[in-house]
């Protein structure tokens, strides 16, 4: 069984017809590469603009505001033996790292 990996990003992600898209090719390739060894869950911000790169992983969560984003972070800490990866430090991801530390988790930044 694969370990869970939660990836937190401030990247804008667009959802169209059940598929997810982003403009940053790194945000596309990193989760897809890690998906071979981990059960990846990607967290990002929702945007209505069209994006270029389709993200081909199963578990993607997008949020419209910081409160729903934080509540999902808290919910994710209930998973045992999970790893947490924060891609780039921004106000959103900095707050995520603080919450993870308060809840006894050690994120990889």
Named regions from a protein language model:
Residues 47-71, 75, 86-87:
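A short, charged, and often flexible helix/loop element on the N-terminal side
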Residues 18, 53, 95-98:
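A short acidic (Asp/Glu
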Residues 32-33, 76, 99:
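Alpha-helical scaffold elements within enzyme catalytic domains, especially in hydrolases
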Residues 1-49:
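N-terminal subdomain of nucleotide-sugar transferases
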Residues 26-27, 69, 92-93:
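Amphipathic coiled-coil/heptad-repeat helices and related helical stalk/stem segments
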Residues 84-105, 109:
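An aromatic- and histidine-rich active-site surface loop
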Residues 16-18, 60, 83-84:
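Short, contiguous strand/loop micro-motifs
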Residues 77-82:
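Glycine-rich phosphate-binding loop signature in dinucleotide/nucleotide-binding domains
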């Amino acid at each position: 069984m694969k370990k869970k990996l939660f990836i937190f990003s401030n990247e804008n992600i667009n959802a169209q017809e059940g598929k997810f898209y982003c403009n940053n090719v790194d945000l596309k390739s990193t989760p897809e590469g890690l998906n071979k060894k981990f059960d990846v869950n990607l967290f990002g911000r929702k945007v209505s603009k069209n994006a270029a790169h389709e993200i081909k992983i199963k578990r993607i969560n997008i949020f419209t505001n910081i409160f729903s984003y934080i509540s999902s972070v808290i919910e994710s800490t209930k998973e045992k033996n999970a790893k947490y990866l924060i891609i780039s430090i921004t106000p959103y991801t900095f707050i995520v790292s603080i919450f993870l530390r308060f809840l006894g988790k050690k994120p990889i930044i």
